[in-house]
Amino acid sequence: MANTRSSSQLVDAALELIIEAGVDRLTLSQVAERAGVSRATAYREFGDKDGVLAAVAQQEIGAMIVATMAGFDPQADLTTQVTLVVTNALRYLRGHRAFVRVRDHEPHWLLYAGLPIGNARMNVVQTVAAMVAAAIPSPDPLALPPLAAAEVVVRTVLSHALIEDSALTDQEVAQAVSRAISKPAIS
């Protein structure tokens, strides 16, 4: 995605339209109109609906990672780190209007959306897990390789964000994730 004023306007407009009416009915023409740019500009910037959706996903996943890592202490123990990441991610997703709209009405977009990463397409779990794995300060306390541990975190968060009814509190979810990815304590 080009980082131009019009591309930013188009991404913001697409996000607004997703909040209002969802992804299925979204068109690039609507996005262009909402952004106040020509259809030609929209097509030049993104090519098609998938292009603008990938740009929205890239922007919003980046924002989620920033929000999730707020207050992260690389010197803290793994349980503290995982608890912070899991609870921040759940809070962020539950408060994200576009995520909630799509979760409630078009969850297939969350489960099967592909994001272009280099020459490959990765699903949301793969994309976020790769970002989380890169942020893991040390693999030493992990019972799994960093990417696998990150995938456990992402899949658990996504599961609890998609299906909110749970007997577990967010804190308990975070503690369960921490136990799942941590090496057992040596006594």
Where on the chain are the PLM-derived regions?
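Short hydrophobic/aromatic patch on the recognition helix
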Residues: A35-F46
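Amphipathic alpha-helical segments used for helix-helix packing
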Residues: L93-P116
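Amphipathic alpha-helical packing segments from all-alpha helical-bundle domains
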Residues: G62-I65, L110-P141, L147-E151
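Solvent-exposed, amphipathic alpha-helical segments
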Residues: A13-E20, A63, A67-P74, T156-H160
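Amphipathic C-terminal alpha-helical segment
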Residues: R91-G95, A134, E151-D170, I181-S187
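Short amphipathic alpha-helix in the helical subdomain of ABC transporter nucleotide-binding domains
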Residues: N3-S7, P145-A150, V154, D170-V173
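Basic, helix-initiating cap at the start of DNA-binding domains
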Residues: M1-R34, G51-A54, Q59-G62
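Hydrophobic alpha-helical connector segments
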Residues: A55, M69-G95, A150-V153
